[in-house]
């Protein structure tokens, strides 16, 4: 029986292994993690992450051929194929701080694999890692090999949170990078055979190691670039009276461009886009390519500009101050159908409003109060002037309340900021919300989810990103 072990029970490792277990009933799959609370959650009725369809997959396989354990060394030693799906955050200190990936967890996983292995292993990079990481891992394993053969493969994930299970069931492609040696090709074939249980052969792409590693960074950079491109156009639309939805639709009809990732918004977030672009920037700088590095930096600068532009629009619209005013924030996760708040634009928007002494009431259907307070207590990392992350002043907490109902969040508010495109925000009773707000009542739609005209008929002053401005807003500066 083939045995697979995955180190890391997070957003990538858990769902990926659950689907492999579902599709390959003859393979034993064990997900290991040093965090007991996390593993306990995976073994409970309340999984540690929210992802549509995940519950059903886990419950069907758990205890049959899918297991979650804290006994990391035992299961690593027994496995034929080891996926490494540990966190690779951006470094916050030292060489490359603010840009380079921190491979501390990766290196400790590699050293542990070398320590406990008693048979040949295929080690698969599942985390997003810098180009040439495989080479470094290979060196650690071979220098500590004790006669054991290791083959390193790169098998980057291309999941989108909120649709991860769907993406795993029907992937656009599965990418496997390996050494172009007989042993390397054999390892690639072994992993191909796992995916071939449900993925058509023409969707399984094999490359060399470095191409696979760079493909993941490039894919995320291209996607983020599209978002920053349409967001840059949204600012111009507001200045000229054009409608960004119409522009994006027209542009997306070009078959060379296509319609995806052309929705203007308050900005992109999530664990990957910013981290991977900064990683790409660092690799370019290290390879003497400053022009290329600056090109990709601009994608993040536009994203930061879009968030600050949104905050400035809120403040300038409300008589140039939100001091002491209640602002309802609807949505805190970085996108709908996930509870993930990593790099969510909501953090920067809230910080901007708190900086002007607003009183903020936050509602998100999937994010806990504890998570929101933790996120807001962390200062923004300035990647051009690196310093270690420090908590902000605790005084900010007094201005923030977290509630479990959109109507409670908006009661008595002067303005509403929609920062996540949860479906429920499209169907709220906005007449009821309007009746219970201070007047004039403002809606700042950071995701373009509401029907602005209907809200104006109710009496709201509405700002939608990249759409023709409400008469009230036309004379207000977009950027302070």
From Swiss-Prot:
Residue intervals passing through the bilayer: none
Alphabetical GO CC annotations of the entry are: nucleus
- Highest taxon in the source lineage: Eukaryota
This protein's pathway reads: Nucleotide-sugar biosynthesis; UDP-alpha-D-glucuronate biosynthesis; UDP-alpha-D-glucuronate from UDP-alpha-D-glucose: step 1/1
A GO biological process of this protein is: glycosaminoglycan biosynthetic process
Q: Which reaction does it catalyse?
A: UDP-alpha-D-glucose + 2 NAD(+) + H2O = UDP-alpha-D-glucuronate + 2 NADH + 3 H(+)
Q: Please give the residue positions where the record annotates the modification Phosphoserine.
A: 393
Q: What does the entry list as the binding residues for NAD(+)? A: 8-13, 33, 38, 86-90, 127-128, 161, 272-275, 342
Annotated keywords: NAD, Oxidoreductase, Phosphoprotein
- Gene3D superfamilies cross-referenced by the UniProt entry: Cytochrome c1, transmembrane anchor, C-terminal, NAD(P)-binding Rossmann-like Domain
SUPFAM superfamilies per record: 6-phosphogluconate dehydrogenase C-terminal domain-like, NAD(P)-binding Rossmann-fold domains, UDP-glucose/GDP-mannose dehydrogenase C-terminal domain
InterPro entries from the entry?
6-PGluconate_DH-like_C_sf, NAD(P)-bd_dom_sf, UDP-Glc/GDP-Man, UDP-Glc/GDP-Man_DH_C, UDP-Glc/GDP-Man_DH_C_sf, UDP-Glc/GDP-Man_DH_dimer, UDP-Glc/GDP-Man_DH_N, UDPglc_DH_euk
Q: What is its EC number?
A: 1.1.1.22
| Active-site positions on this chain | 272
One molecular function GO term is: NAD binding
Residues the record lists as binding substrate? 157-161, 216-223, 256-269, 334-335, 447
Identify its protein family. Belongs to the UDP-glucose/GDP-mannose dehydrogenase family.
State the function annotated in the UniProt record. Answer: Involved in the biosynthesis of UDP-glucuronic acid (UDP-GlcA), providing nucleotide sugars for cell-wall polymers.
Which protein is depicted? UDP-glucose 6-dehydrogenase 4
Instruction: Tell me what organism the protein belongs to.
Output: Oryza sativa subsp. japonica (Rice)
Q: What is the lineage of its organism?
A: Eukaryota, Viridiplantae, Streptophyta, Embryophyta, Tracheophyta
